Amino acid sequence: MNSLVGDVPQSLSSLDDTTTCYNLDASCNKSLVEERPSKILKTTHISPNLHPFSSSNPPPPKHQPSSRILSFEKTGLHVMNHNSPNLIFSPKDEEIGLPEHKKAELIIRGTKRAQSLTRSQSNAQDHILAERKRREKLTQRFVALSALIPGLKKMDKASVLGDAIKHIKYLQESVKEYEEQKKEKTMESVVLVKKSSLVLDENHQPSSSSSSDGNRNSSSSNLPEIEVRVSGKDVLIKILCEKQKGNVIKIMGEIEKLGLSITNSNVLPFGPTFDISIIAQKNNNFDMKIEDVVKNLSFGLSKLT
């Protein structure tokens, strides 16, 4: 019995040793799992004496990972350790680390940004001043326009523009009517002047007399009666002459000599005479007065008798 009791502590001690060894193996395996590197490099040589870890073979020493900072610059790749005592950065240190031309570029960029901001502010103020001046001019012109419109009741811009348009249209119509009346008056005065005919005396000196005058002397009995009317470039010539062969052609020739182009002609026999109506146009070189046309036609046609 005593032997059995003596054997129990030994068995318990051996069990403790086994448990301790088992715990040691578990902790070793756990440390191996935790401390295994993130990437295993391939090797070309395999050692034949590679055995699994056991209690007799101690585990390899723990490898403490060290964090590093990669600094990318043009000079190359630099690796910095966090454990370094001088690992303190500031913007000034970064600027000091830049080359001189980089610093100059940064300074130029900052200057350009400041200048562009100043220019944009000055441009905005100039635009505001220009817009203010433009509105002042526009207001002044509206005031001046409203002073020219008679009977203006409202002073707002829409009313001023509407009444101005109406007044301008009224003035245009008045000008057209005035021009038409002026043309009619000019035509009447031309007709009165052209109704006078020229009579040549015995000395071939022209003397004016009315075409409606029935008292004719013997020297004017054979002369044709001439009436001329002018409207712009159009000339209407009416001639009453004796009925003779060739007179019509000769009369047209005399008219063309004066710088007139005949566009239409009409000849009607009236008793012993011809009533000739001719419409002609002034040429570019025509610069004669109405009286001169009558005189030259009378003098040229007097040779026909």
From Swiss-Prot:
GO cellular component labels: nucleus
Induction context: By cold treatment.
Biased composition (Low complexity): 207-222
Matches recorded under InterPro entries: bHLH-TF_ACT-like_plant, bHLH_dom, bHLH_transcription_regulator, HLH_DNA-bd_sf
Keyword Translocase: no
Feature: compositional bias, Polar residues: 44-56
The protein's name: Transcription factor bHLH18
Organism: Arabidopsis thaliana (Mouse-ear cress)
Gene name linked to the record: BHLH18
